[in-house]
A protein has these predicted regions:
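ATP-dependent NMP and nucleoside kinases share a basic, alpha-helical "lid"
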Residues: 44-47, 56-126
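Short, flexible coil/linker elements and helix-boundary hinge sites characteristic
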Residues: 24-28, 95, 173
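NTP-dependent small-molecule kinase module
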Residues: 2, 8, 15-16, 109-175
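Hydrophobic beta-strand segments of well-ordered beta-sheets in folded domains
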Residues: 4-9, 28-31, 53-54, 100-105, ...
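Conserved substrate/cofactor phosphate-moiety recognition/catalytic segment
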Residues: 5, 13-53, 62
Length: 175
């Protein structure tokens, strides 16, 4: 499903239409807002990707993140966390969704503590070079795209997603 020549980047946090629009004007970036009504599916976009960078705002783990936060607010919702985890894993296995090569967390100082614990705690602990904080400006995102670090890829999500109930907010990512 994925175009092997495209680096897939999901932008999260303070994502604006202006940032995506300006990034999309760059010759090497295809930038899309996939969370809007009527947007193409990720499968369609990945199948047609023809630029070095595909930047979009559709976090494949958004429902899992919400369920994880909900579980720590109310532990009786562990079933919701398990359902969302299995749904994400099923979507990955079916090729309906993919983990991006990178997450860019825009305006990390402006996100909620819960979002910070998820993106900069849980996800960054799994693959530190794949989750990067960046200022919420087109210029800053463009600089980051030009200097994305190399590092180990995401490990198989099955193990770490199914162990999310053991990742405690405020402790996620700490050794």
């Amino acid at each position: 499903m994925r175009s092997p020549g495209s680096t897939v980047v999901v932008v999260v946090g303070e994502v604006t239409d202006a940032i995506l629009r300006e990034l999309g004007r760059l010759p090497n970036v295809q930038a899309l807002r996939l969370t809007e009504e009527g947007a193409p599916t990720l499968r369609e976009v990945l199948g047609a990707a023809n630029r070095p960078f595909l930047v979009h705002d559709l976090d494949p783990l958004a429902a899992v993140a919400a369920a994880w936060r909900g579980f720590f607010d109310d532990p009786s919702t562990i079933g919701v966390l398990r359902v969302e985890t299995e749904s994400a894993l099923t979507a990955f296995a079916a090729g309906e969704s993919v983990l991006p090569d990178y997450y860019l967390v825009l305006d990390p100082e402006g996100i909620t503590p819960a979002e910070s614990q998820w993106w900069l705690g849980v996800l960054a602990a799994v693959a530190p070079s794949r989750v990067l904080p960046v200022e919420a400006t087109t210029a800053a995102v463009q600089r980051m795209l030009a200097s994305l670090p190399t590092g180990r890829a995401w490990p198989d999500p099955t193990g770490w997603l199914r162990g999310l109930h053991l990742q405690v907010p405020d402790r996620a990512g700490l050794l």
